[in-house]
Amino acid sequence: MNPESQEVASLMDELELVTKLDERTIEVRIRGLRAEVSDEPPCREFLYELMAFAFMESSATDASTWGTYFCPQMVFTNPDGSAREFPSLSNVDEETIDFWSSRSNQTSNMLMKARYSDLVWDLCFKCTGKKPSHTFALSSLDALLSLIENQLYMHSIDAIQKLRRAFALGISLSNQQLVERAKNAALNLEDKISDDNMPGLWGFCFDLIVDNKRVRKTSEEDRQIVADLEDRYSRLLSNGGLWPCECAAKRLGKYYRAKGMNDEMEKVITAFGELCLATAKDSPPMAAQQILRQAYSVYKQFNMNESLSKILTEIKELGPDLIDSMLTHEFRAELPKEELLKFAQEIVSGDCTQVFSRIVIHYLPSIRESKQRLDEGIQQYPLAFLFPRNVCDREGRVVSTVGPAETDYDGLLISQVSQDMAIYSVSLDFVLKRAIEEHSLGPQVIVEYLYASTVFPSSQRELLASGIAKYLEGDYLSANHILTPRIEVVLRKIVEQSGGRVLKEARAGGFYLRNVDELLCSEEMLNIFGSDICLYLRVLLSDPRGWNVRNDICHGLGVDACFSKTISDRLVHVLLLFAQLRPKTV
């Protein structure tokens, strides 16, 4: 079935008589005119009408990438990585605009008139280069307000969205009469639909009138809206949820701060913070931590430093309970001993130079494979990657947040590389032991190999020999504390030899040394090692989403890291990696 223009017109005439409609309903009805699989191109009227009601309306927190009010409903990624949108702005031409313009004049349905008129006003110049008449903005604004005033909306949240658009249009036109009409519509709407425990259905009068500098209002209007919000906040503190309370507290706090009423601001925000503390005490540790972080965020927004310190103390004290409440998930994998022995023998055969080079190459994480595993996980378990994850230390302190996939793919990749390194640690441990046994490796042999490279400062030789000796003796506590700072020294030497800078200006005068993560992100390191190896070093040494060895050991934060042979093996691997940097031979 491929609709003809007459069929489209008949459907639109039918919908014209329906007083309560939304754009989604119209879009679905239009789609129903066309067979799901059809080789015949649809008539132009079908495409024009479908696009008109398929466009989404953007919000202040989710702005359109086109720089317009309307935005695509869906964005697809093509196999070549390019984006494909529906509806696409490229399909809107002068004929499309003319069609919508004509429909705007023909229809008496308020929803349709608002949509057609606003499409012309919003997209005409963007798509055709021609400025539309301001009458389209006036027509859309009048229709939007009529919808709200006559309660012709299907969903309250849609009415609020249309009200926000009406304010934006009225302000852009500098039409004070219509802005006044929008103010009255807003006050009446909030009075009709507000529910204390549904914060999406109230507060918009404050946002659109009190907190909007471009809207003229009297002191009485301000006072009444704020008084209503204060009453609502009082009710919520008694029996409301944290989220509604936060929404009210932040609005009131912002208002009082702007008016210079700091005592009132602190009173409002403190009441919310105390509610968070009381709620956290009666909540499981994991929920309690999120509640305390919620309070911390609000206190920070309003620069209440004394209260911030109190919340931080509560978060720290909660740490052990948080760790105890976490579940342990284990997985087992078998490594056939014969295959492992055969593999290790292949690695350790030959002279020491060959062995060290093989170990370096084989145990560099494959970022490409980690990306592949991550992408497979996102595809197979999409829900698991929709939400952020907290990374905690052994005391329950949140040290970083990873994800979700849409906004923090890099963080998830670091987490994946970290997991892959842990899996390969068993094999690395076995191979290093075999190499030490096979070649009777002692501290001097390894140090001599390292110092064939020019990146190891002579001043660090004794300390490196001591750290390697402790590693070979099985004193991993000492080895980790000796070798970790040596790696940082070598990193600075590599950057210096490459013409980079290792100092940065201190705020109080003088200079600081650049930290490990800054060195690993430097252009010099990227030019020498490439992005994959630099990412590996960051995961191991400096990124809190990874192993973060340098931070944990040098700041005394990670007891496990201090004693870990797995960490020692990786530190030795990094030293061998650095040793691959040799002077050019002619």
Feature locations, PLM:
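N-terminus-biased targeting/localization segments
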Residues: M1-M286
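Short, mixed-charge amphipathic alpha-helical segments
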Residues: A452, L519-N548
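Internal, Lys/Arg-enriched amphipathic helical interaction segments that engage polyanionic partners
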Residues: R293, N305-V445
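Amphipathic alpha-helical interface elements
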Residues: L47, R103-M112, E149-D158, D196, ...
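Charge-enriched, short contiguous segments at helix-coil
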Residues: Y536-V586
